[in-house]
């Protein structure tokens, strides 16, 4: 027993040391957008501070789960006067000129007219240094969508003028914009002359009819105040209107927040969830209206307990979506404040939990996660303004990104959330097919590293109890109003060690050959990250690469095994040394012994 105790002590020591809280990064500025700017497969953060946008490169190796992540400031470029209010700035990223480098679409809200002035900043290399050049785009009603409308693989700008008429443009190699034919009139069939856009709500680019091809959903406001989702489906000819989603009337729900998109009940169909508010400010959320293709409008319970919610100025975005618990049911995050006096806003994870007593045969409900998050010192002393999910170590386990004010400055930090039990995940990232020098698969990089907006994927597998698990999601379904969707798809596989039976991937492109827009992968090992490249002019076939991420339990087990081996080696060395010492002593005794035979 005494010999076993040291080994048990070492195991506990290693397990404890590997589970210690790592020091999370803390940076100055307001989060503007996410993207992989330097093609190293890590998600970087575009930050606005004092009139300047700065790319903060995340430095962490894909398989190095022991090293804490850190951010290094990179290219900076001034977009306004230093005194500009950060609440007036919005960003979205994409490859607008087809050079496989991330460009930045910036909109600045005019304080008087409430119109957004859009400027495209294109990335270029000059004298081996990255620079960003500005090109004025348009004055629009709110921040525009950054999606590929024309099927050429380049990111286009789709928005609305202040009078409600559509603005749609693509760009050439030099970055200068070219209006598409009649402002997208040939891309959209019988598009209305004007739409009354619902202010503060991001438009969506998601699959609503389960064909894995993303549809465009414009958030509009009817004359009676109803929220109407104008859906446009990609067809062989053009984008065509589809009257799929019935409007939400003020008689039913007079006040609503910005919709979010997820497969809430993990049935293989995407759901649109609209927060139902008690008042126009949306401080109190009572429940969520849920729409899907087969179930139409229903209700999902949302238990906020005694908390009110905090949203940003000029925006109706309340919740942000992510697979936090990795149980195949997406969760949400919200900034909330207790109703009792002298309380500060806090970040809360809304667990997607099973519901057995929900109305109208509902099966899921959202409830505040019981486990409290330990905040860093500055964050706990500051005033929290915004929160979202972020994968700090690129290990498939989502952490919390928190933006707050402290000492008169806007800052953001992170809360590490590594303990997800023995759950597994599948991480999928679909890149654009338009490439330059980054499209030759090398040992450490593949493709353009630019996430394709609207790429959708679904998976199916057998769980540990003999049942089936499935889910569907679309990559970056919204890019305006600081929706801050991460540039990849993350699926929780629960506690099942089984392989993923099938993964279906599709890009928002209509083609006669199914192989041109859809691809399937089978028998995928859990805890994997898959990078997918659709067909392009350079490479006419689908390309994929799989990276396996070891879980924390595996790392701890390997560390314990290594320490035990070291202990055994030390014991062997010690016994060998003692044996040699005894042999030397015996030889000395032999040399001093009197030999009677010699007499």
From Swiss-Prot:
GO terms for cellular component: apical plasma membrane; lateral plasma membrane; plasma membrane. It comes from Caenorhabditis elegans. The chain crosses the membrane at residues 554-574. Expressed in all somatic gonadal cells including distal tip cells, anchor cell, uterine precursor cells and spermatheca precursor cells of the hermaphrodite. Also expressed in the pharynx, pharyngeal-intestinal valve, intestine, excretory cell and canal, seam cells, a subset of hypodermal cells, vulval precursor cells of the hermaphrodite and hook precursor cells in the male. Glycans are attached at residues 50, 117, 163, 361, 378. The keyword Transmembrane applies. Belongs to the TIP family. Its main location: membrane. Probable cell adhesion protein involved in gonadal cell migration. InterPro entries: Integrin_alpha_N (IPR028994), Tip (IPR024881). This is Protein linkin. Disruption phenotype: Hermaphrodites are maternal effect lethal and have elongated and strained appearing distal tip cells with abnormal migration. Male animals have detached gonadal cells that do not migrate leading to a partially elongated gonad. RNAi-mediated knockdown results in a mild defective gonad phenotype with 11% of animals having detached gonads and 17% of animals having 'stringy' gonads. It is found in: Apical cell membrane; Lateral cell membrane. It comes from the Eukaryota. The lineage of its organism: Eukaryota, Metazoa, Ecdysozoa, Nematoda, Chromadorea. It is a single-pass type I membrane protein. Pfam families: C2_ITFG1. One of its GO terms (biological process) is cell adhesion. Residues 20-553 are extracellular. Keywords: Cell adhesion, Cell membrane, Glycoprotein, Membrane, Signal, Transmembrane, Transmembrane helix. The gene is lnkn-1. Residues 575-599 are cytoplasmic. Residues 1-19 form the signal peptide.
